[in-house]
């Protein structure tokens, strides 16, 4: 029979109607001569009651069997306010078995105790859990909001190629061998960067796309080898115009999904300020704990750890926690410092005028008073500090700062703090390649402040780029593009690309800019990460239908896998044993 309703649809107004529902058996409960079945489908749960004279209909039925039931809607005596159908139940007339199920490797419940490996191996069962299905529904809603907002502003959705050209800049490419063109490879896109820029050269005014991207990099909880991003570009636009557009969309997402109305413009924090105060270019500003430079306080110190910091051009930096941290908490924070290549984490505790801690006995009276004034200490505090090169000590204290917030629950999980990080360095030093490389990509316009000497003053060169940050996570990045051939040539030379390499890898791209290009700017943000944060998921894998594990393996189908020799032979490829 045809399904008349879903399992989340019926209520008290449907009493006495004959209905047909279809779904999975969630639970079977016998109470005397009566049996109750919780029937589940994608939409919800409805209770089915099987009377004494109908017990033969449920012989051999088990959880996760798929059935069709027909019966009459009746009012429940014992109501369940936790579900929309909790006022009614179905008095069964007939049950039809659609399909049986083997015993599942775990119970289909939200809070089931099962390893992630098992969940990923049986992802199709894991996806039956309401928690994971809700994540997929929210993801679909966010995608819908994005499309509506961009289309309302006259953006055109254009699909760009998945098979492209490998370039030496950026992360490792996933390569795809070509059978028809022997010994050649396509590269799966790390982003549609070059294609979307060419769309602007082609005369498109506003472009957007929800697109799958691929990066062959080390994985963690918020990374996957394939991921989805919102990609956009605008002709004749400044950085501010792009930021305004993205703000509008992200605020709409929060309003419709979380009911949060961001009325104020997002703050814009320069990169160097973010590093100085928070030790990170993606600061979590839900809590204070700002990093302070303490060089002046310890200018003439007798503390052995700090005594030669000036000669070695090092910085003494620290944070102040308005609590007395325990020995166990300090051990955890010291381990965090060690993960950032610092052997220890100095500390000093203050309580009602008394000092203690690893450096307390060596503090002079002047240093004590200066620390109290610097951190505005009242009754009690723990100061965490160390010495090192400015960038490294800032990075370490940024990690310690976040760990303190985690230990002391300083960050409200339902508080969302969005901000822009601007004025990024144009370059970053690559230890692996022993040269400066483009921090974002070699097509990002230098900031007007750096336009005259960006190829010679690399350490101070600033890019016209920007990141959107939420609660310590980078949501996305964008920038103004280089459209002047002279500036582009200077940029290529600055990152060590010779003419032959430029022509080989980018000739097809830069040639387009010889034919009249508008100034343009764009942005892209990771949809997977946005959904992860909106749902408070611990891992990005919980918001992707069929994810890979931390080793890039699909536990369900065992991809990547070996292929037959004849397949490799067709591609002129041999494997190295």
UniProtKB/Swiss-Prot annotation:
What keywords are annotated for this sequence in UniProt?
Aminoacyl-tRNA synthetase, ATP-binding, Cytoplasm, Ligase, Nucleotide-binding, Protein biosynthesis
Annotated residues for binding of ATP? 215-217, 224, 474, 526-529
Q: Where is this region: Aspartate?
A: 193-196
Q: In the UniProt record, does the keyword Ligase occur?
A: yes
Subcellular location, record wording:
Cytoplasm
Catalyses which reaction?
tRNA(Asp) + L-aspartate + ATP = L-aspartyl-tRNA(Asp) + AMP + diphosphate
Annotated GO molecular function terms are: aspartate-tRNA ligase activity; ATP binding; nucleic acid binding
Recorded superkingdom: Bacteria
Keyword DNA-binding in record: no
Which CDD domains does the record match to this protein? AspRS_core, EcAspRS_like_N
Q: Which PROSITE patterns match?
A: AA_TRNA_LIGASE_II (PS50862)
Main EC class the enzyme belongs to: ligase
- Where, by residue number, does L-aspartate bind? 169, 215, 440, 481
Q: Which InterPro entries match?
A: Aa-tRNA-synt_II, aa-tRNA-synth_II, aa-tRNA-synth_II/BPL/LPL, Asp-tRNA-ligase_1, Asp-tRNA-ligase_1_N, Asp/Asn-tRNA-synth_IIb, AspRS_core, GAD-like_sf
Q: Name one GO cellular component term.
A: cytoplasm
User: What biological-process terms (Gene Ontology) are attached?
Assistant: aspartyl-tRNA aminoacylation
Q: Which family does it belong to?
A: Belongs to the class-II aminoacyl-tRNA synthetase family. Type 1 subfamily.
Enumerate the NCBIfam families for this protein: aspS_bact, PRK00476.1
Q: What is this protein called?
A: Aspartate--tRNA ligase
The species this protein belongs to is Mesoplasma florum (strain ATCC 33453 / NBRC 100688 / NCTC 11704 / L1) (Acholeplasma florum)
Gene behind the chain? aspS
